[in-house]
Amino acid sequence: MDIKLINIGFGNIVSANRIIAIVSPESAPIKRIITEARDRGMLIDATYGRRTRAVIITDSDHVILSAVQPETVANRLVSKEAAQVDEPTD
């Protein structure tokens, strides 16, 4: 299994294979998920002090905060997958 990495902003990289969801932090349920992850010690803040614009939820129950828009992260994820499909295999 190949490890696919995705840039989530400011040089921070996450394994794309582990991402379950990329969501906006605005709703109350997502804010609750962030608070619960902080209490469990499963929160990773990759915003560098900037405003949180995307919340990435992984299959290991880690919650990652990013200062990049969810659409941008999703586009990077899709473009990485498309690039791998286009690569010739010998």
Swiss-Prot record:
- The residues forming the signal peptide are none
Give the matching Pfam families. RemA-like
InterPro entries from the UniProt entry:
RemA-like
The record's section on NCBIfam families has: MtxBflmRegRemA, PRK04323.1
Instruction: Family membership, please give it.
Output: Belongs to the RemA family.
PANTHER family reported for this sequence:
REGULATORY PROTEIN SSL2874-RELATED (PTHR38449:SF1), REGULATORY PROTEIN TM_1690-RELATED (PTHR38449)
Q: What is this protein called?
A: Putative regulatory protein Dred_1699
Instruction: Tell me the organism.
Output: Desulforamulus reducens (strain ATCC BAA-1160 / DSM 100696 / MI-1)
